[in-house]
């Protein structure tokens, strides 16, 4: 089951390019964003974000972000 808050964290990281800026946009801590993404990656069984500066979505991450935009 994909939950809204995890998908929102993924979309924010991809949009903002960093966990820290995504956390500010979502009004949570960077560790909360990281934990949500990690749990989502575990559920999906693959990496969703390439960590770096800037953070970028993998192909699967991009598809999930597109799904999030439609929901």
Predicted features and spans:
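Alpha-helical residues within the helix-turn-helix
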Residues: 24, 42, 62
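Short helix-boundary/capping micro-motifs
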Residues: 12-27
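A short LG(V/I)-centered, amphipathic sequence patch enriched
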Residues: 41-57
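Conserved hydrophobic/aromatic "anchor" residues
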Residues: 7-10, 19, 49
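Alpha-helical linker/hinge and terminal dimerization helices associated
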Residues: 7, 43-44, 64-71
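Short, basic-rich loop-to-helix N-cap that marks the start of a DNA-contacting helix
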Residues: 1-5, 56-62
